[in-house]
Amino acid sequence: MLNCQFYISGKQAFRLARVYGKVDVAVTDSPIILGSFYTDEEYIKTACIGEDGKYKNQLNYFIERRKAYNPAGRNQTEDEAKEIDVKVRAMLDKLGKHYVSVEGTLEGYDWIVEDVLIHLNKLTLN
């Protein structure tokens, strides 16, 4: 578990709130809902899930690991990180959070960009 998850999730929520309605897209590798995974405190889980629910038109992507694991700056071994992947997916499924699995490759990243652009075009047409 990361230390002080309440602070980490709160800081992320603040960053998103500052740009909400001012930009077309906000990209993060640390969505607020992920904070609910990294805590055992129910009030933090509830706050993260509630805050996440405020943001509409979300696109969520689960990046499948494809490159060599780099342990620098990590709190987990590769096997532990893979276990977390499984548990995070289970949490997202349990919460009914829609996400798309994408290969962690340049082609996968390009696909995400295209998908975001398609969704942006749909929003502007409506």
Feature map (PLM): residue ranges:
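Charged/polar, solvent-exposed surface patches and flexible loops
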Residues: 7-10, 14, 18, 90, ...
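Conserved nucleotide-sensing/catalytic segment adjacent to the nucleotide-binding pocket
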Residues: 1-45
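Secondary-structure boundary motif
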Residues: 18-22, 94, 122
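A glycine- and Lys/Arg-enriched "phosphate-lid" helix/loop adjacent to the NTP-binding pocket
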Residues: 42-117, 124-126
